[in-house]
Amino acid sequence: GHERTAHFVTEYEDMVAHQDFDEYLKELDEYREYYKEWVKRVDACYAKNPEIEWSKVLEICGENRWPGPTGPHFEYRPYGLYESMLIRVAPYTIKGALYYQGENDENNNEIYDILLENLITEWRRLWHDDELAFSIVQLPVHDPDTEKTGRGWGGIRRAQDKICRTIKNTSLTVITDCGNKKNIHPTDKKTVGER
């Protein structure tokens, strides 16, 4: 499966190959300051009107320049979370993993099963446990327009289902009925947690 996903690493390496590290750090500091101020404006919008729609928030606060400059501290670099977070907790004993992600991979839904299988394999290797339990929370329905096309999150859900049917000691928590069209994060946390 790695040959179909190797482009994530090569694209990143090409982007940073000739990067001036000092210039990158300067851009990163500027971005972090900008982002902190942008979040304050967004929080103020929601404090005034908790029911405000996201499009209106963007109209008032301006577009977000997220996710910031690409470089060695870029949170979405290949293996970024693995290197900055997962390795730190890997020595500790766990019974399993509850995995509730995939929203940002809707453009990769054709290979999401490979990405998820690789992730499970790597985590099991890291914890030295070929039987490490994985409970995958299936993405909810969020945008009915893309759902009709069979792309977007629908493709991710199909990949999540496939993985749970083909990889041992995995399970799937279905929450398709818990979505919210106006909020990417379902507000009904209790139902999701109970399942």
Language model regions located:
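Cell-envelope and extracellular/periplasmic
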Residues: 1-195
